[in-house]
Structures are given as C-alpha cells and as structure tokens.
Curated annotation (Swiss-Prot):
InterPro entries: Phosphoglycerate_kinase (IPR001576), Phosphoglycerate_kinase_CS (IPR015911), Phosphoglycerate_kinase_N (IPR015824), Phosphoglycerate_kinase_sf (IPR036043). One of its GO terms (biological process) is glycolytic process. It is found in: Cytoplasm. It comes from Bifidobacterium longum (strain NCC 2705). The lineage of its organism: Bacteria, Bacillati, Actinomycetota, Actinomycetes, Bifidobacteriales. GO terms for cellular component: cytosol. This is Phosphoglycerate kinase. Keywords: ATP-binding, Cytoplasm, Glycolysis, Kinase, Nucleotide-binding, Transferase. Belongs to the phosphoglycerate kinase family. The keyword Transport does not apply.
Amino acid sequence: MKTLKDLGDLKGKRVLVRADFNVPLDGTTITDDGRIKAALPTIKTLREEGAKVILMAHLGRPKGKVVPELSLAPVAARLGELLGANVPLAKDTYGEDAQAKVAAMNDGDVVLLENVRFNPEETSKDADERAAYAKKIAALGEAFVSDGFGVVHRAQGSNYDVAADLPAAAGLLVEKEVKALSKATENPERPFTVVLGGSKVSDKLGVIENLLDKANRLVIGGGMVFTFLKAKGYEVGTSLLEEDQLEKVKGYIETAEKNGVELVLPTDVVVNAGFPAGDTPVAPEVVAADAIPADKMGLDIGPESQKLFHDKIVDSKTVVWNGPMGVFEVPEFAAGTKAVAQGLVDATAVGAFTIVGGGDSASAVRNLGFPEDGFSHISTGGGASLEFLEGKELPGLKVLE
C-alpha cells in the first residue's frame, strides 16, 4: 500500500484528501468529533510540508440531493477551531465555488469541499458515470490521499475512482488502521480473544466465519447473543431473535468446539418488560441466561457475566471488540458494555494489544467516559473494520496498492 512518503515533495502541490467526517449531529452541533480529530495528523503533516490541502467528505445520506441540514458547515467550523486556522467551505464539490476557493489557496491552506454525497454520481452503481464525475474532482488536485477509513469498503467516486486519476496514497489514519487491524488478525499474540456484540448476528456472520479458526476465544453479548442462547435450547422470552440464523449459529457452536475455540456466553442477563422507549420507566431484573421469563426482554449481560467477560478479556494478549453488550444508551443497561471496555483497558495496561472496532463500540467507549489512550487502537470505521475482520478485499485499499 502506498503511503504519504511515496508522493514525494508536496510543497505547493494541491492535495485532495478524502477524509471521514461523518459525525453525529444534533441540529448543527457535533456530538462526537472523534472522526475529525482522527484526520488531524494527516492534515497537519500535509500543511507542514507546504501542500494546499483540499478536503472532501460525506455526511449522512442525502441520496444525491442538496440537503442543507447535511452541509459540512459545522465540520468546517470545528476543523478551524482544532487547527487554529480558517477552513473555508466551498458551496459545491467541484463546481465554480470549489474551483475559485482552490485557486485562491496559499501553501499550507486548508479548504473543505461540500458534502460529496450531494452529487448523485458519488454513489452511482454505474462505473462510467462515477469515473466521469471523479475526473471533475481530480481536476482540482495534483495528488490524492485516502484517509477516510470509514469508507474504504465502498467503491465510490471520491475514494475509489479519484485514485485512478491522480498519484494516490494512504493517509496516516488509513495506514494506522490497516497496521492495527492486520497486527490483530494476521499474526496475533495469543491468547487472541474476539468480543462481539450489537443487535444482529446477521451483521457479524462474516467476522465469526473468518475468525473462528484464528481466535482462541469468542466472547458473545449484545442482542445477537439471544440467537446463540436459543440455539443452545434456552428460551429467550421477547428478546431479539433471528430465527433464520439458528441453524448457522448451531454450526458455529459445533465448529468452535471442534476447533478448540472457547465460546463464552453470558450466564445471566438483565431483562425488562420491553425495549426502553421515551420516558417509560424501566424495571431491570437479573435472571439466569437459561431462565428468561416468557414476557421479558434481555437488554444487557448480568453482573456474573460482566465479571466473567472482564476476566476472560484480561487473560488475553490480543483483543478485538466490536459491538456493545447491551442498550448502553440507557444507564440501567450499560454495565455490560462498561465491564467489557474496562476489561480492554485493564488488559492494555498489562501489555495486551487491544482494538475497539468502529461504530457503536467506539461511541460507547467515548460516551461512557473511557480515556481513548486506554486502548491500543480505536477504529474509526464501522463497516470498514468489520469487512477487514471478515478478511474481505476492500476496494478503497486495493486502489492504493
């Protein structure tokens, strides 16, 4: 994979950087700026080299139309604060305003182009249409840096097709992500523990299949665990259940046994009368995993399982975690996710290599107040880190080879 140093001297050069600024917004307020901060090392390095830094990114799903609420204006403002420099936002991605703002740049300046997904061609399935659009963006720059790890699993105009038109390389964030995820999956120091959560088994099938013969231990929680418990013959009440995945999950349980992979499931769960909605009071109670009442829904792993999961994680040299253990946004159902996060922090402190997969696990870690440096690596890619863990070839990385 080509990296920044492969681009040579960038002084005075216009460098297009595809970043991942898909941040959560509350109106125009950014509620988690982790992805913006993750892009800073690449932006600062390019500025120090005297490059003109032209940033592009998407926000939300405007579906090819201009949606004012999904403008990157809040991102430009936050970036300016973090860099201590003015970051003008172009009104378009490659049109007159973008061209004018780029033409006015001095060495070391930073400009942000408007949301690439305001253009229907960005996500078009028609390769020719995407390529023609990418050429218009590429015309703004003289080199391309791919630094949006959150989109490398997609072949889209601004991260895949642009790379064909300009000298292209991975930015520091993409390089760091690939190094960390490769270190965990290609030659992990053992014991290697994979912790999976989140609501659906169907989202994690590929990861389980790819890691069942690599991991020493698979720890499972979150909504997806009830399909495992049901596959073991337990009743799961009104908990989330994917009936159509039961046979597959039974197969995984058998394969784990056959491969000598330790499969760790919760022994107790926290249940409630239903999914917590609005101001409805919750009445959490702890029950054994094999004794979930018919009218109750499991929403977190119980205290006994929290200790079990924590201890299994600490007894590891490599840990990859993807997906929360429960409905962590509701304090009564956050303890399981906290216990797992604490397990990773404690394992890291005694020398383990730990990765928090992107998406919900990364927001959980931040929202629950854990220090980012308590983990070896927090991935910025939800789907991208999952597909990497599935062993898939990612189009946005392939174009940088």
